[in-house]
A protein has these predicted regions:
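Charged, often Cys/His-bearing segments associated with DNA-binding zinc-finger transcription factors
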Residues: 2-23
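Basic, short loop/linker segments at the boundary and entry of helix-turn-helix/winged-helix-like folds
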Residues: 17-45
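Phosphate-ester processing/binding pockets and catalytic centers
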Residues: 35, 44, 54, 61-69, ...
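Active-site-proximal, Lys/Arg-enriched surface segment
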Residues: 48, 81-188, 310
Length: 337
């Protein structure tokens, strides 16, 4: 019988996985020596095949569709118990991809390393480190993992590089458990502002607990993880010149590391970020300098002052963008364009 997938009250027939996909077998031998035996290597190929051919890419569904074994726990045990090392597999993958694409990649000066994070939503809470993470797109808090990822782009070549799992501070440190332990008579606020004030009150006391302090030092911000991904790409000798990231990662620590590593960087700037007014001169439509009051001006206040004649058309593919360029200083970041 073919596996059946239930989707919102409907059942859809899925084709079984009877053998690894040809694209998998064509490249899998590169990884063969990283596995202890043939069974492990076969599970590895079946899992990759499931990720490619199945719409539902969960481990449970891939296991359901693999027909080679009556024991449907084999693939699960491969991930949870088998002594293989995913870091070595990814290292080998990157070496292989860079070697296979060296003739078609673009110049190093035009190559990008893109940093971003995403939400991998889950139905259940049995996964390690699953938590409620904020979704900026729809203002919700789904149950999910929140990996920070790096992606490589060079001409026609593009592939995922690496990831680091972000864990919220309260989940990483088991904060609520320690609060109940040290403050059994206190209730934990639910609103964001009240919770932040409560943190300031109780955290210094919690940090005196060696067990909490140990977990506290294990916490990594998304900026920390982005820097780790940048360092990993450099360690792998990935040829790129430009680091690309959104406004969430526009922080002094990441920018400083990019400069230290001699990488150009491109980011978005939130409209409420301040610019130092003494670092630039803005002129009106007739060329007269516009006087700006105070040491700082927010981006959202500056944009309406830019005359329409100052914009220039830039065409990329079939799209035209109207752009304005200005070199300014941002507090904490220094001079940027």
């Amino acid at each position: 019988p073919y596996p059946i997938l239930w989707v919102k009250g409907q059942h859809l027939m899925q084709l079984p996985i009877v053998a690894p996909a040809p694209v998998v077998t064509a490249h899998a031998d590169v990884f063969r020596d990283l596995f202890e035996n043939r069974c492990q290597f076969q599970h590895f190929q079946n899992y990759l095949t499931g990720l490619i051919v199945l719409d539902n890419k969960s481990l449970a569904n891939i296991t359901r569709c693999v027909l080679e074994s009556a024991d449907k726990t084999n693939l699960s045990r491969f991930f949870s118990e088998a002594p293989w090392f995913q870091e070595r597999v990814n290292d080998r993958r990157l070496v292989y991809l860079l070697d296979q694409t060296k003739e078609i990649r673009g110049p190093k000066a035009d190559a990008l390393l893109i940093l971003d994070d995403t939400l991998c939503e889950h139905v259940g809470s049995l996964f390690d480190y699953v938590d409620r993470h904020y979704n900026h797109g729809n203002d919700t808090y789904p149950l999910a993992h929140n990996p920070v990822t790096s992606h490589y782009v060079s001409g026609p070549v593009r592939f995922p590089m690496d990831l680091r799992l972000y864990r919220r501070y309260e989940e990483c440190t088991q904060w609520e458990t320690f609060v109940h332990q040290h403050f059994p008579d206190r209730s934990i606020p639910k609103t964001k502002k009240e919770r932040a004030r409560f943190h300031k009150e109780v955290d210094p006391i919690l940090l005196a607990d060696p067990n909490f302090q140990k977990l506290h030092h294990q916490f990594r911000t998304k900026i920390d993880l982005g820097i780790a991904l940048l360092e990993a790409a450099i360690q792998h000798k990935v040829p790129f010149r430009v680091l690309l990231f959104d406004s969430w990662y526009l922080a002094e620590e990441l920018v400083s590391m990019a400069r230290y590593r001699k990488k150009d960087w491109i980011s978005l700037l939130k409209k409420n970020r301040n610019l130092e007014t003494n670092s630039f001169v803005l002129k009106d439509a007739v060329g007269t300098p516009i006087r700006l009051e105070g040491p700082h001006i927010a981006v959202e206040e500056l944009v309406p002052l830019i005359p329409p004649t100052a914009y220039r058309a830039v065409t990329v593919g079939d799209k035209t963008y109207w752009t304005f360029t200005l070199a300014v200083r941002l507090p904490g970041l220094g001079k940027v364009r």
